[in-house]
């Protein structure tokens, strides 16, 4: 059963303002990348939590993201920085295409790894990896171009086992959070 959303009106306002800011960054990035066409920013593979939280949660305090490369344009990097600001009490992990395959090979049984290996589309591989990793490790998955609209410490509650987002009455997959559910 879904829990009521805390601060729902404030979250809606914040989301609108953040989208406006994001669009401004995108507009600015066009002339920026016209002047510096080869310049890319590096998203770190690991960034530890910046503050220690006293809040204990069932959901692991790790943000997971994946992309074909951690060398990104200004808008994607600005989005990463904004998400870090909204998740200061969480570790951050970026996983590349190659690292996704290595992780699944090291942590899955042969049947599961073979199923992953048959996927040829990068988006399908990322979908498989995100669900597999969340079940193994727990934590929060956010698409590389997705943004948090409110501090994650205010979204995930102490006893939440999973947090999913609905948009127009349908569940999305750009944000998924769950506790570790490794098979025993």
From Swiss-Prot:
Keywords: Glycosyltransferase, Transferase. GO terms for biological process: mannosyl-inositol phosphorylceramide biosynthetic process. It is an enzyme of class 2 (transferase). Pfam families: Gly_transf_sug (PF04488). The keyword Glycosyltransferase applies. The keyword Transmembrane helix does not apply. GO terms for cellular component: membrane. Belongs to the glycosyltransferase 32 family. This is Uncharacterized glycosyltransferase in aroQ 3'region. It comes from Actinobacillus pleuropneumoniae (Haemophilus pleuropneumoniae).
């Amino acid at each position: 059963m879904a829990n009521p959303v805390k601060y729902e009106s404030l979250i809606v306002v914040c989301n609108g303002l953040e989208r406006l800011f994001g669009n401004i960054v995108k507009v600015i990035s066009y002339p920026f990348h016209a002047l510096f066409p080869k310049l890319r920013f590096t998203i770190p593979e690991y960034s530890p939590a910046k503050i220690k939280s006293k809040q204990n949660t069932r959901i692991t305090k790790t943000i997971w993201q994946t992309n074909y490369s951690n060398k990104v344009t200004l808008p994607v990097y600005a989005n990463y920085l904004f998400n870090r600001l909204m998740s200061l009490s969480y570790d951050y992990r970026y996983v590349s295409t190659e690292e996704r395959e290595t992780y699944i090979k090291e942590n899955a049984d042969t049947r599961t790894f073979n199923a992953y290996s048959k996927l040829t589309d990068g988006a399908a591989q990322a979908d498989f990896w995100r669900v597999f990793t969340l079940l193994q490790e727990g934590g929060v998955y956010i698409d590389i171009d997705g943004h948090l609209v409110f501090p994650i410490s205010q979204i995930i509650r102490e006893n939440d086992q999973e947090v999913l987002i609905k948009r127009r009455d349908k569940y999305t997959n750009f944000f998924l959070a769950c506790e570790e559910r490794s098979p025993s």
